[in-house]
From Swiss-Prot:
It is a multi-pass membrane protein. The gene is mdtD. It holds the Pfam family MFS_1. GO terms for cellular component: plasma membrane. PROSITE patterns: MFS. This is Putative multidrug resistance protein MdtD. Belongs to the major facilitator superfamily. TCR/Tet family. The lineage of its organism: Bacteria, Pseudomonadati, Pseudomonadota, Gammaproteobacteria, Enterobacterales. One of its GO terms (molecular function) is transmembrane transporter activity. One of its GO terms (biological process) is transmembrane transport.
């Protein structure tokens, strides 16, 4: 007979596998984009929609995931998330055109949006409060391994099999996870307040139309009139949500959040910063393969120092922020990240390839320092009654800004390369160099926002990872 302790342990393993699937997918696809483009007969500089469609879907669906779990139960929502993610992966592998792949990635994104937040909620419900931190450390460890192995695994599969296998690899894990969820996961429910369907639809339309407008010309080939229409639709939708949320206690996100100066600064700074940082995982593998002629596997291996730097930095972030304070850490880390990011193409084009892993290592360190510090700064002064709403809005904003970052990177590459590309040529080097220069400026700009953080804002609570 399975004891309660053993049952909980298996349930934690199920959540951990969900975290692994979701985080692996965020990095494994980037390395494969040039190969996918060649297979589908597309320009590799116009493949950002494959990433944007997934990340944007996650951003749109995040607000509904927690409510669905409370309403239907964590077991059935987590099971549905795994099934959707796995079926979406199968459809991605079967895609014969770019549009088919984008639609399949949307389906994947619906599952991915529910998997991680519902997994966190599951842990809260199945372990005692005093064991929550230890349980979360256990289930998030595979989530840290996913980004570490993703680029190299993606490059290996593309080079020695085909790009289809970066999606097919999810199938056995998904089937096992779905069966284990059915057999072992309890179906905890909670009483729920009324879901703000109107607000959800307004925000979804606003985010989707504005992101599509940004990606419309280079990624989707839309006319200027269509892009203007999307922008107008997005502005109207977001303005309508603001009006809808005024004095509405059932609003998806309370407008009282913006009365908190630190939260508002942190949210605006986080969104601005993640636009720049969101460009890096998309731009770097493409630069290595198209700009420098690296093989997919070699490009994937080159991404590992960035992940190692990120994981290593997380162990000392608390001490760094306690020593220097939020403002100094965020301003200096932001400016240093801009310099380090620009140095990558300079070092590579000058032939100093041995320094590239060092540059990527420091890039990962600075990114992790900014991310964790921004997350905690944003949430640290919120009262308990607004903490859940504030955290959900921050999570949604993070995903949205990363999709904007990928779209922006695609626009820059397409503009400077004039939508024509040849591997490892002076013209291609120039296109990437100008793109990285613009990206470095975008990365540096949030320092102006972070400089407005009060200097006495110190680290008096555990930093968000």
């Amino acid at each position: 007979m399975v004891t309660q302790a053993t049952s909980v342990r298996w349930q934690l393993w199920i959540v951990a596998f969900g975290f692994f699937m979701q985080t692996l997918d965020t990095t494994i696809v980037n390395t494969a984009l040039p190969s996918i483009a060649a297979s589908l007969g597309e320009n590799p500089l116009r493949m950002q929609s494959v990433i944007v469609s997934y990340v944007l879907t996650v951003a749109v669906m995040l607000p509904a995931s927690g409510w669905l779990a409370d309403r239907i139960g964590v077991k059935w929502v987590f099971f549905s998330a795994i099934i959707l993610f796995t079926f979406g992966s199968l459809m991605c592998a079967q895609s014969a055109t770019l549009n088919e792949l984008i639609l399949s990635r949307v389906l994947q994104g619906v599952g991915g949006a529910m998997m991680v937040p519902v997994g966190r909620l599951t842990v809260m419900k199945i372990v005692p409060r005093e064991q929550y931190m230890a349980a979360m450390a256990f289930v998030t460890l595979p989530g840290q391994i996913g980004p570490l192995v993703g680029p190299a695994l993606g490059g290996f599969l593309v080079e020695f099999a085909s790009w289809h296998w970066i999606f097919l690899i999810n199938l056995p894990v998904g089937v096992i996870g779905a069966l284990a969820t059915l057999l072992l996961m309890p179906n905890h429910k909670m009483s729920t307040r009324r879901f703000d369907i109107s607000g959800f639809i307004m925000l979804a339309i606003g985010m989707a139309t504005l992101t599509l407008a940004l990606d419309g010309h280079t990624g989707l080939g839309l006319s200027p009139l269509a892009i203007a229409g999307l922008i107008l639709c997005g502005v109207i939708a977001l303005g309508s949500y603001w009006w809808h949320a005024l004095g509405n206690r059932f609003a998806l996100f309370s407008l009282h959040l913006f009365k908190n100066k630190i939260y508002t600064l942190g949210l605006v700074g986080s969104m601005s910063a993640r636009i720049g940082s969101g460009m890096l995982p998309f731009m770097t593998p493409i630069f290595l393969q198209i700009g420098l002629g690296f093989s997919p596997f070699h490009a994937g291996l080159m991404m590992i120092p960035m992940i190692i730097g990120s994981m290593g930095m997380k162990r000392i972030i608390v001490q760094v922020v306690n020593r220097f304070g939020y403002r100094r850490v965020l301003v200096n880390a932001t400016l240093l990240l801009a310099v380090v990011s620009l140095s990558l193409p300079l070092v590579a084009i000058m032939g100093w390839t041995l320094l590239m892993p060092v540059v990527l290592f420091f890039q990962g360190m600075l990114n992790a320092l900014r991310f964790s510090t921004m997350n905690t700064l944003t949430l640290k002064t919120l009262p308990d009654r607004l903490a859940s709403s504030g955290n959900s809005l921050l999570s949604m904003a993070m995903q949205l800004s990363m999709s904007i970052g990928v779209s922006t990177a695609g626009i820059l590459l397409g503009t400077f390369a004039h939508h024509q590309v040849a591997t490892n040529t002076p013209a291609t080097h120039s296109a990437f160099l100008y793109s990285y220069l613009c990206m470095a400026i975008i990365i540096a700009l949030p320092a102006l926002i972070f400089n407005r953080v009060p200097p006495d804002t110190g680290a008096n609570r555990h930093l968000a990872r």
